[in-house]
């Protein structure tokens, strides 16, 4: 079976670094989808009025990747919101129903980065060319810390 891998973790936990390296292992059969990259390609990074467009682009890329039968599709995002991951699972299930050959069907896997502590993520973010910022990362951490048992420091 083919795989759709959802990275899961707060910003700067290593998701994109891992995903970019992973697709290089088999570039002919692997693809990475990332909304941040779509935003950067569209001009100014954060334009709230453009988010529906970005979401539609991501959906189109996913459908095309499935139709082109890539072996591995990595959705390189936080994937922390259960509602969003549930939607992705539903879309994949519907697409799988259209394939007669089981070898064309996809399974969903989670590549988990939720064990990377907040302090490590904040340090990594501070070294980025375009940091997200401590307040934003802490906000995301606080929103999901109970759901995923997120840790603030390496000592916990």
Placement of each model-derived feature along the sequence:
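Conserved GTP-binding G-domain of TRAFAC-class P-loop NTPases and closely related GTPase folds
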Residues: 1-8, 13, 21, 27, ...
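Glycine-rich phosphate-binding loop used to anchor ATP phosphates in small-molecule kinases
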Residues: 49-106
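Conserved nucleotide-binding/hydrolysis micro-motifs of P-loop NTPases
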Residues: 37-39, 79-80, 114-120
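Conserved substrate/cofactor phosphate-moiety recognition/catalytic segment
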Residues: 17-72, 122
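Conserved beta-strand segments of the P-loop GTPase G domain that flank and frequently precede/overlap
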Residues: 74-76, 111-114
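Short His-Asn-centered micro-motif
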Residues: 8-9, 35, 75-78
């Amino acid at each position: 079976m083919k795989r759709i891998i959802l990275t899961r973790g707060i910003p700067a936990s290593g998701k994109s670094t891992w995903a970019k390296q992973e697709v290089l292992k088999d570039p002919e059969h692997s693809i990475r989808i990332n909304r941040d990259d779509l935003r950067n390609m569209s001009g100014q990074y954060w334009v709230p009025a453009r988010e529906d467009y970005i979401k539609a682009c991501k959906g189109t890329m996913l459908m095309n990747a499935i139709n082109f039968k890539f072996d591995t599709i990595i959705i390189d995002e936080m994937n922390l919101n259960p509602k969003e991951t549930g939607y992705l699972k539903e879309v994949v299930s519907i697409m799988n129903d259209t394939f007669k050959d089981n070898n064309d069907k996809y399974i969903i896997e989670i590549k988990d980065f939720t064990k990377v502590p907040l302090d490590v993520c904040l340090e990594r973010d501070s070294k980025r060319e375009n940091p997200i910022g401590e307040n934003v990362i802490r906000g995301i951490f606080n929103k999901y810390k109970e759901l995923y048992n997120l840790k603030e420091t390496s000592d916990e």
